[in-house]
């Protein structure tokens, strides 16, 4: 499945959404051996952030996903290579980027050799995994995880597809959410950038 996702083609279109302030973006995937496009994820205003009194975008399931299925691999500009994940998240360049509002920084195990690569997903393309928010501060739990290698995988039984016929609050179980980890939030505390700023996605 991971190899097929890597070789996928992606397309997207804006769809009118009467329950929100702006259209939502449906992202479609076509596998290497398929002729058909299928909805994969949806970028829309985040129901999680709304619950926290904030505004920003979030990532939703465009089709139903079940536990163990992969959505894609986290991509982004390579910031640097480090011996450990903590080294990556506490490096001087990481702090500089965070102070400039780059909050899509993720450390993943290096594809070639030991150590970790720090990726800045700020301008990454489809399937826009960097848009997934952390549910910290709400009563919601994560429904996906990011593996050491940077693959986003469903961890709860079933994530239903986003529906344009439902409100954002009614779609909240479709929003993809993962725990960024204590190291991520500890760094924001150290730098004086509060959690509210850190999780906001523009």
Language-model segments: which ranges?
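C-terminal SET catalytic tail plus cysteine-rich post-SET Zn-binding segment of SAM-dependent SET-domain
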Residues: 5-8, 136-202
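Catalytic cores of histone-lysine modification enzymes
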Residues: 16-17, 25-145
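Short linear sequence elements within intrinsically disordered, low-complexity coil regions
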Residues: 22, 31-33, 79, 87, ...
């Amino acid at each position: 499945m991971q190899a097929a996702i890597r070789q996928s083609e992606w397309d997207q279109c804006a769809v009118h959404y009467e329950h929100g302030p702006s259209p939502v973006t449906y992202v479609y995937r076509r596998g290497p051996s398929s002729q058909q496009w299928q909805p994969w994820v949806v970028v829309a205003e985040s129901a999680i952030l709304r619950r926290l009194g904030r505004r920003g975008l979030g990532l939703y399931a465009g089709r139903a996903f079940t536990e163990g299925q992969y959505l894609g691999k986290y991509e982004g500009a390579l910031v640097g290579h480090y011996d450990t994940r903590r080294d990556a998240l506490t490096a001087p360049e990481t702090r500089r980027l965070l102070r400039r509002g780059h909050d899509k920084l993720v450390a993943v195990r290096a594809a070639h050799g030991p150590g970790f690569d720090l990726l800045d997903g700020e301008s990454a393309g489809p399937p826009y995994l960097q848009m997934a928010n952390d549910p910290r501060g709400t009563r919601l739990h994560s429904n996906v995880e990011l593996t050491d290698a940077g693959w986003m995988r469903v961890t709860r039984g079933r994530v239903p597809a986003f529906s344009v016929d439902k409100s954002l609050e009614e779609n909240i179980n479709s929003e993809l959410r993962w725990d960024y980890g204590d190291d991520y939030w500890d760094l924001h505390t150290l730098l004086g950038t509060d959690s509210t700023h850190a999780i906001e996605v523009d």
